[in-house]
UniProtKB/Swiss-Prot annotation:
Gene3D superfamilies: Ribonuclease H-like superfamily/Ribonuclease H (3.30.420.10). Belongs to the RuvC family. One of its GO terms (molecular function) is DNA binding. Binds 2 Mg(2+) ion per subunit. The RuvA-RuvB-RuvC complex processes Holliday junction (HJ) DNA during genetic recombination and DNA repair. Endonuclease that resolves HJ intermediates. Cleaves cruciform DNA by making single-stranded nicks across the HJ at symmetrical positions within the homologous arms, yielding a 5'-phosphate and a 3'-hydroxyl group; requires a central core of homology in the junction. The consensus cleavage sequence is 5'-(A/T)TT(C/G)-3'. Cleavage occurs on the 3'-side of the TT dinucleotide at the point of strand exchange. The active site is at D7, E67, D139. It comes from Prochlorococcus marinus (strain MIT 9301). PANTHER family: CROSSOVER JUNCTION ENDODEOXYRIBONUCLEASE RUVC. This is Crossover junction endodeoxyribonuclease RuvC.
Amino acid sequence: MRIIGIDPGLARVGYGIIEIENERKILLDCGVIETGKDKKEEDRLYEIFQDLNELINHWNPTSAAVEKFFFYRSSTTISVVQARGVIMMVLASKKINVSEYSPAQIKLTIAGSGKASKKDILDAVMYNLDLNKPPKPDDSADALAIALTKLNEDGFN
């Protein structure tokens, strides 16, 4: 089983790819898709589309986990929702099963509390993946936490 966790955004889309092999969780790749602030929004969305397609074609995940987005009154809300729509479209076009999790669900599953801190989440990601140093940048660590939430739901604790 191979899963991609995705932390949506317009400026940065975090991703983390984990494989289960002999009941061990193995980190295959993590990072961010960054779009330049100097580009037009439609070009940034297209960049997410292209880069995510490349990642999926390279790693062939069998499932995906994406952070749910809740409406907040913010000038970036619409942009993030549009980026999330592009992400969901790419996953649907590849026939990848998608699970969605709220930030509180992710925190509860990974760190044992729906109000866990960023450090608690990072520590849990490092522990679960047997990492010596934290994944960078933070968006990729968040994406790994999202993927680990899905794996936990599927019984890979």
